[in-house]
Amino acid sequence: MPVKAGINGFGRIGRIVLRNALLHGDIDVVAVNDPFIDLEYMVYMFKYDSVHGRFKGSVEAKDGKLYVEGKPIHVFAEKDPANIPWGSVGAEYIVESTGVFTTTEKASAHLKGVCKKVIISAPSADAPMFVCGVNLDAYDSKYKVISNASCTTNCLAPLAKVIHDKFGIVQGLMTSVHATTATQKTVDGPSNKDWLGGRSVGNNIIPSSTGAAKAVGKVIPSLNGKLNGLAFRVPTVDVSVVDLVVRLEKPASYDEIKQAIKEASETTHKGILGYTEEKVVSTDFTGNDNSSIFDRDAGIALNKTFVKLISWYDNEWGYSRRCCDLLGYAAKVDGAL
């Protein structure tokens, strides 16, 4: 029997998590909560998507519920997570995708009645972070609130793990060339905490900070303090790319590095770390399920210990798929599946 799940926040990630959950045999989404989107608008937003296209199945509002493929999904509109009646519909696992309740304390408001676990679809300051293909073996059922880290960490960490396990990473710097997200401005506007973040997204390349590289040290402890990074926000609607420059402990040719990544993509990291030999651009990865897709021909080496590696990721779709995978994995370990 699939585990019953709820989604709090029906924004970009919430909606795409639902699309992915419908393809995931272990998850049955029984409820969605969003105080800012009424039911009829939920139908519209789920049906039409400017990036991922129109939903191919049926979606409608009926009897106060959201019906997707003929299946009813309860809809709530509570601002306070503590007031969401997850228990009334039997939702045991909650995807917290508002981007607001990202600490253990705030996300724990969901934990009452039958609710067993909260998966935060964002980095968290204090909740344990888990990245599929990297550190799931560290998961323990005692954790009630966990984080799926960020989309960029999900791209970087599997690549870094393969390289570190095979050749050893002495140190590295990452640049993420990141597509537009909902927090950015269409025209110049106020952004007191991040002045650059207030500049218009449509006609600028915007330098930005990211904690993705440092977060790798949390999921791969042996890399703690060895990686750092920054980001550029660019005027594209989806799909981002990681540029990782590393100094290797064990000398290796670029061909040897490519082969190690290719082998991992076909074995230990299949479905997580992809590998492409095609001549590709960003839109070619829209809807790609992998967390990270290594671009064989885009990287370069200065010598056998200093290399630049390029890996793509659909920061919406691939990340949302990992939210579902993490939920399913946790449920199995917890004995809920």
UniProtKB/Swiss-Prot annotation:
Alphabetically ordered keywords of this record: Cytoplasm, Glycolysis, NAD, Oxidoreductase
Disulfide cysteine pairs (residue numbers): none
Positions marked as site (Activates thiol group during catalysis): H178
Pathway(s) per entry: Carbohydrate degradation; glycolysis; pyruvate from D-glyceraldehyde 3-phosphate: step 1/5
Keyword NAD in record: yes
Active site: C151 (nucleophile)
Biological process annotations from GO: glucose metabolic process; glycolytic process
Gene Ontology molecular function terms on file: glyceraldehyde-3-phosphate dehydrogenase (NAD+) (phosphorylating) activity; NAD binding; NADP binding
Binding site for D-glyceraldehyde 3-phosphate: S150, C151, T152, T181, T210, G211, R233
EC number, as in UniProt: 1.2.1.12
Stored SUPFAM superfamilies: Glyceraldehyde-3-phosphate dehydrogenase-like, C-terminal domain, NAD(P)-binding Rossmann-fold domains
Gene3D superfamilies, per the entry: Dihydrodipicolinate Reductase, domain 2, NAD(P)-binding Rossmann-like Domain
CC per GO annotation: cytosol
Binding site for NAD(+): R12, I13, D34, K79, N315
Domain of life: Eukaryota
Location in or out of the cell: Cytoplasm
UniProt catalytic activity: D-glyceraldehyde 3-phosphate + phosphate + NAD(+) = (2R)-3-phospho-glyceroyl phosphate + NADH + H(+)
Main location: cytoplasm
Similarity annotation: Belongs to the glyceraldehyde-3-phosphate dehydrogenase family.
NCBIfam families assigned: GAPDH-I
Quaternary structure and partners: Homotetramer.
Name of this protein: Glyceraldehyde-3-phosphate dehydrogenase
Source taxonomy: Eukaryota, Fungi, Dikarya, Basidiomycota, Agaricomycotina
